[in-house]
Amino acid sequence: MDAWLSRAFADLAPLIQAGPVAPTIDMDAFRTQLRGFDFERPLAFEGVLQWTLQQMQHGIVQMSNPRYFGLFNPGAAFPAQCADRVAAFFNPQLASSASSPVPVEIESHVIRAMAHRAGLGPDATGHFATGGSEANYTALILALTAAHPGFASDGARAFSGPPKFYTSRECHIAWLKIAHQAGIGRSALRLIDTAGHGRLDPEALARAIAADRAGGAVPVMVVATAGTPGGGMIDPLHGCADIARAGKLWFHVDAAWGGAALAAERLRPLLDGIERADSITIDAHKWLATTMGCAMFITSHGALLSEAFHASTSFMPSSLAASDPYLNSVQWSRRFLGLRLFFVLATAGWEGIGAHVERSVAVVARVRDALVARGWTVANDSPLAVLDVVPPAALGEVRTLVRRVVAAGRAWVAPTNFEGRDVVRICATHGETSESDIAALVASLDLPMTGRP
């Protein structure tokens, strides 16, 4: 069956790459078929597997299609796909270093390598997480714990006033859910205005912190985003770090997407200042070509990480705060997530993965030049691989245009709002996007006006 599945994947790959990017499935018909699985009698696994592959071929946005220019989701590299199979075969439990010493050490090795790349000190530590939201939640918990030792036992009641933390209006809005989850309420998040170009305004940040303090609130954390979701912008890292240090606040860099620039020598200077962070989030599943669910939380405060997530029980095989993941992270039971990035880095090296990241930037530059030549207007000036553009008036309203492009199936882009303006958002993360894929995207965007096929 394993050989059959490998052949099926090999047969499907060219069909997916050449086929429509958006789902084409009839969901009513699918639900009718799905109701046939009543679980009252066993079915042959081969038939169930074949049926599932058919539904997946037509029932998802195909992020492995090189004409997917959408959100921060890459085509997964083959080594990362293999890592999932290895992890599933051995199925290690990474809660404890005693039960899974090799997987835990592999993950720690990758975390240390990424921390070194970011310029953090030799004592930096961290862990893999299911996504950027979990990693960012970890940052908030550490910030609250650092701000008041009583937070661990008393929660928000330990503070003399309501805790507050700060990030740009262009941030990933999952921060609202994170504040809710942490028990400090969504009003704890202060969204700071930009300076007009998609980057947080440090002067507005300083004013907000001062006003909150004057009103009796307790500022605890400043978050700078390195690669905003809408425009791919990088907040002023040094400016944010200066304000955080002056106010004795935790400084976190949400580099979930843009952190991949650390792999590329030409792009690393864009993240100058990240080395001053108390903690960093990087999602390998955004731009480092792993499968989904592979994020990293990195911090230079290992002792605080253990303090925030410590627990004591007699049934675990070990209780080493520095090395047992269940004692220094949100999760208890854990999958071997880090093997995906280990395989990618081991087989490509920093040079190879850096070339992958730089190639994405070059792809977006090619798209930009082609669209500008056709009368489109660029709305953002990201040095990374996100392009926000406004179509010529003759093409109509942005969201209607995007719906037409997606429905046609030749490419996938997204609408968003950047600095109060609706734009077509184009992002390149796929390692095999070709000149013909770029041409297909441009033709799809231009088609309503020109009528070209």
Predicted regions and their residues:
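N-terminal entrance/gating region of PLP-dependent enzymes' catalytic architecture
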Residues: 1-123, 424-427, 433, 444-445
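Active-site nucleophile and cofactor-binding loops and adjacent substrate-binding regions
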Residues: 102-103, 126-133, 167-168, 225, ...
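Short loop-beta-helix segment that forms the pyridoxal 5′-phosphate
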Residues: 114-142, 190-193
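Conserved PLP-enzyme active-site core in the AAT-like
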Residues: 135, 141-306
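Active-site C-terminal subdomain of aminotransferase-like
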Residues: 228, 272-374, 379
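Conserved PLP-binding catalytic core of the aspartate aminotransferase-like
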Residues: 377-405
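Conserved PLP cofactor-binding pocket of PLP-dependent enzymes
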Residues: 381-386, 408-425
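PLP-dependent enzyme catalytic core of the Aspartate aminotransferase-like
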Residues: 418-453
